[in-house]
Amino acid sequence: MKLSLHSICIERKYPLLRAIGRAAELGYQGYEIDIGDFGDTGLGLHWPEEYTPEHVAGAAGAAHAAGIEISSLCLGVLWRFYPTSPDAAVRAQATEIIRQSAGLAALAGAKVILLPIGQPEMLTPEQARDSLVDVLRTCVPEAEKAGVIYAVENVGQALARTADNLIEIVSRVDSPACQVYYDVGNATSQGAEVGADMRKLGKRIVMLHVKDFQRTAGRREVAVIGEGAVDWPGVAAACRDIGYDGFLTLEVPGTAETADDVAVRSRDALRRLGI
């Protein structure tokens, strides 16, 4: 399997283009760009400057020069614009963001677009899933045309918390361009049996987020790989059982002071664990 680095790990220390090169220097084969927020620049056609086609092409060029891939795009901006929102205008904005991200991903050479999906408090999980499925059915033709995959992540929200929830969403959308981005750390923090989840999801998993969790003063906190509660031998066994050999994307936040150290320690831990 190949290792990828999510931008949250390193971009507090390095700007995007340098971060991509640094990821390669640290022994990673991929980089996940997080489109985290649009700030005050608007929506839809008004993408922030760093995420315009010209800048995304620059990121792809930096990755090629460094000898790594842009493995995926993460639409972190969806934490602001929920595709499950009861507000039709917000849903429309989220839909347009998701649709347009397909072209950006293709330009970057990324095959996967991570969709972190929140659930508004006033909706039941069933209502939120219905809204999400409607949005994704609208968007998947763009992904199919671009040759990329929208991957719904288990971020801990009730609408997509379990393997069965994720299978329902993917089955209802019914497109090869809609699959699952499984986060082993999030699943562990929610009490899931990760190996069983992964085997149930099987080939629907197109990418994995890897991070660890530990409890500190009663709170769950993200930890370096191997320093928390995740059953890593179980993760490795499940990967073998389902034939997963894609990217493992590290998502352990680093500060300007700790970014390199966190990336190296997590890389080494994953290799020691045989993942």
Name every feature range the model reports, one short phrase each.
Residues 10, 249-262:
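A short, acidic, flexible beta-alpha connecting loop/helix-capping segment that sits on the rim
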Residues 80-81, 120-123, 156-160, 186-189, ...:
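Short, small-residue-enriched loops and turns at beta-alpha junctions
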